[in-house]
From Swiss-Prot:
Its cofactor is Zn(2+). This is Acetyl-coenzyme A carboxylase carboxyl transferase subunit beta. Its main location: cytoplasm. It is found in: Cytoplasm. Pathway: Lipid metabolism; malonyl-CoA biosynthesis; malonyl-CoA from acetyl-CoA: step 1/1. It comes from Synechococcus sp. (strain JA-2-3B'a(2-13)) (Cyanobacteria bacterium Yellowstone B-Prime). Residues 37-307 form the CoA carboxyltransferase N-terminal domain. GO terms for biological process: fatty acid biosynthetic process; malonyl-CoA biosynthetic process. PANTHER family: ACETYL-COENZYME A CARBOXYLASE CARBOXYL TRANSFERASE SUBUNIT BETA, CHLOROPLASTIC (PTHR42995:SF5). Its EC number is 2.1.3.15. One of its GO terms (molecular function) is carboxyl- or carbamoyltransferase activity.
């Protein structure tokens, strides 16, 4: 038995032992999960070695559940190595309304910025995917639930305008609870601003692919997330404007349909174009981008029709 085989067998035995019912097994399970060596799937309760889960793009190998990932992880998974060029890194949110709930909005921002090492809930920039240049934006749900404030909307609008000017395809990954209430109307106006920028991108006949990740709600759903020329979603994603509980309490007509607001339900109703597992997403995006690239003949010189001589038909 090679050394690698020995480690694989040891890992397998450890995984089996962690399912035991003795107090010692339970204590070790808690300790090793706390140490970050193992992660428990919230869907099937399977324990997976953290490194194995990372190699599988944070997708449970047992049931296919897609764990939530960060914006930097998403970019690392998708883009060609060394191709990422961030844009508008200097933009940071302020507190124009001096909003206060349980604590000042400015303090809440500082807490999330320290916790996530992000200035706001989206990363935008340029890169390449399988050698194809793209403009890409990825929302990060860790930052205030991925809520869209003035900076998030501004960065997405600027990215879209850059893609329009540079004739680049645009890819946006959504993960949001909606507009950021702490910024009031300044957050709501981002819906119109991002939608207008995307219309100009469409008028320039450039491709926009929207990718829905869990969860996507509120003003993000009501604006750029559902405006893609192609709308993709990861399996099991929850997508909607208001949550199911809010809808049930508002309309007062009992339970909503089973699986309401899931990606699978939306696909069956024709609201999205495809459900793509995360492990296949890079390949599928590359295929779609390649299909929509300008054809070679479009760059050839045009033919002067007057210089042609028509031959008589026999």
């Amino acid at each position: 038995m090679s050394l690698l085989d020995w480690f694989a067998e040891r890992r397998r035995q450890t995984s089996l032992n962690l399912t035991g019912s003795s107090p010692f097994d339970k204590e070790r399970q808690v300790r090793e999960i706390a140490d970050g060596l193992w992660q428990k799937c919230p869907a099937c309760d399977t324990l997976t070695y953290t490194k194995d889960l990372q190699q599988n793009w944070q997708v449970c190998p047992s049931c296919g559940h897609h764990h939530r990932i960060t914006a930097p992880e998403r970019l690392e998974q998708l883009l060609d190595p060394g191709s990422w060029q961030p844009l508008d890194e200097h933009l940071a949110p302020t507190d124009p309304l001096h909003f206060f709930d349980q604590k000042p909005y400015s303090e809440r921002l500082a807490t999330y910025q320290e916790r996530t090492q992000l200035k706001d809930a989206v990363l935008t920039g340029l890169g390449s995917l399988e050698g194809i240049p793209v403009a890409i934006g990825v929302m990060d749900f860790r930052f205030m639930g991925g809520s869209m404030g003035s900076v998030v909307g501004e960065k997405i609008a600027r990215l879209t305008e850059r893609a329009t000017c540079d004739h680049l395809p645009l890819i946006l990954f959504s993960a949001s609870g909606g507009a950021r209430m702490q910024e009031g109307i300044l957050s709501l106006m981002q819906m119109a601003k991002t939608s207008a920028a995307l219309q100009r991108h469409r008028d320039a006949r450039q491709l926009f692919i929207s990718v829905l990740t869990h969860p996507t709600y509120g003003g993000v759903t009501a604006s750029f997330a559902m405006l893609g020329d192609l709308i993709l979603a990861e399996p099991g994603v929850q997508v909607g404007f208001a949550g199911p509980n809010v809808i049930e309490q508002t309309i007062g007509k009992g339970k909503l349909p089973e699986g309401f607001q899931t990606a699978e339900y939306l696909l069956a109703q024709g609201l999205i174009d495809a459900i793509v597992p995360r492990t296949e997403l890079r390949k599928r995006l590359a295929q779609l981008l390649s299909m929509h690239r300008p054809r070679l003949h479009m760059s050839l010189p045009s033919i002067d029709s007057e210089a042609l001589t028509l031959q008589p038909m026999l």
